[in-house]
Each structure stands twice: as structure tokens, then as C-alpha cells.
């Protein structure tokens, strides 16, 4: 598919699509496991959560392979800087959300920051490989920031919402991430 760019871009593309699928599995799990006023069997919730985790692990694996195997034709931002920014960002958000706003810390904060870091590294890789232009890269950096800010807002207000509003609030970040990943895959496909 990406013969001009080698197998690295094809692997990265598969990882991006798999992360969109992971978001879809997570949506199904959330919809079943947290549906208000209905209890589902624990085994069903478990199967859906395992499917979500499997998709996520495959996605990160393929994306990491594509990132580290990609041939660079121009300078990008060092991956270490993006990772360090993610660690610092996570600690700051953890302190602000928990100590300042007294919001219980959950896995979702880690997932939001982790997705942002991974997505920014992917955008940087696509730029450095020559597949994304300055404009493409800027667009996806802005899109990543919008999704992160909106997801953090949903994260912060979740426990203050009544059942049905909280249920819907939990869907929003997953939908946004899925759309962002599909948009990135589309632009990659068009630029190949």
C-alpha cells in the first residue's frame, strides 16, 4: 500500500486503524458495562474489555514498529522530548485534577495523556518521513489538542453528572479519538 515509503508506513497505518478499532471496542464495552439501571453479566463485560485491551496492545505494537522503522527525510521533534512532555503533563494533570479539584484518579487520565503522546509522535513521524506536509502536521497537532482538552473536560465533570449524562459523557472521548484516528488514516491513504 505504501510502497514508496516502505513497510514502516504500512505497519503504522495498520496500527492507526487498529487504534480506531480499539476505540470502537471500548465504546461497546462502555455502552454495555455502564448502561444505567441494567446489570450485565461480568463475563460479558470481561470479554469486551479483553477485546479492547487486545486491540489496544496490537495498535500500540504496530504503531511503535512503524515509528521506529520509518525512514526520516527531514528533522522532526525528538521522541524523547514528546515522551518527557507527556510525563510532565500527566503529573501536572494528576496533581491538578486530584489535589486541586479532588477528582478521583482513574485509568482514563493515563489513557488520555498516553493517546496524546502517541498521536503526537505519530504526527511527528509522518512529518519527518515526508508523508505529511507542514499543514497536515499542524492540522493533526491542533486536532490532537482539541480532542485532549475536550476529553479532559469530560473526565473532570464525569462524577458530577447524573447517571444518563455521565453515561453519554463517557462515550464522547472515545468517539473523538476514533474519528481522529480514522481522519489520520484517511490523510495517510490519500498522501501515499
Predicted regions and their residues:
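Hydrophobic cores of alpha-helical transmembrane segments in multi-pass inner/ER membrane proteins
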Residues: 17-27, 52-57, 83-94, 144-155
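N-terminal topogenic module of multi-pass integral membrane proteins
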Residues: 1-78
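Short alpha-helical packing/oligomerization segments
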Residues: 7-10, 121-157
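Transmembrane alpha-helix entry/boundary detector in multi-pass membrane proteins
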Residues: 42-48, 68-85, 105-113, 136-141
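Small-residue-rich segments of transmembrane alpha-helices in multi-pass membrane proteins
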Residues: 49-52, 111-123, 171-183
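Interfacial loop-to-transmembrane junctions
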Residues: 156-178
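Juxtamembrane boundary at the C-terminal end of a transmembrane helix
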Residues: 181-192
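C-terminal ends of transmembrane helices
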Residues: 28-38, 92-103, 154-162
Amino acid at each position: 500500500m505504501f510502497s514508496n515509503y516502505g513497510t514502516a508506513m504500512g505497519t503504522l497505518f495498520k496500527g492507526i486503524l487498529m487504534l480506531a478499532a480499539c476505540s470502537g471496542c471500548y465504546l461497546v464495552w462502555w455502552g454495555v458495562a455502564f448502561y444505567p439501571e441494567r446489570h450485565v453479566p461480568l463475563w460479558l463485560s470481561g470479554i469486551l474489555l479483553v477485546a479492547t485491551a487486545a486491540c489496544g496492545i496490537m495498535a500500540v505494537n504496530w504503531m511503535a514498529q512503524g515509528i521506529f522503522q520509518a525512514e526520516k527525510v527531514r528533522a522532526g521533534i525528538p521522541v524523547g522530548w514528546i515522551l518527557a512532555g507527556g510525563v510532565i503533563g500527566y503529573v501536572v494533570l494528576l496533581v491538578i485534577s486530584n489535589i486541586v479539584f479532588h477528582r478521583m484518579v482513574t485509568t482514563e487520565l493515563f489513557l488520555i495523556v498516553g493517546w496524546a503522546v502517541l498521536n503526537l509522535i505519530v504526527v511527528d513521524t509522518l512529518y519527518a518521513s515526508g508523508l505529511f506536509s507542514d499543514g497536515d502536521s499542524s492540522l493533526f497537532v491542533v486536532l490532537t489538542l482539541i480532542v485532549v482538552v475536550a476529553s479532559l473536560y469530560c473526565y473532570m465533570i464525569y462524577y458530577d453528572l447524573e447517571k444518563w449524562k455521565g453515561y453519554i459523557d463517557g462515550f464522547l472521548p472515545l468517539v473523538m479519538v476514533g474519528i481522529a484516528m480514522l481522519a489520520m488514516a484517511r490523510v495517510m491513504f490519500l498522501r501515499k
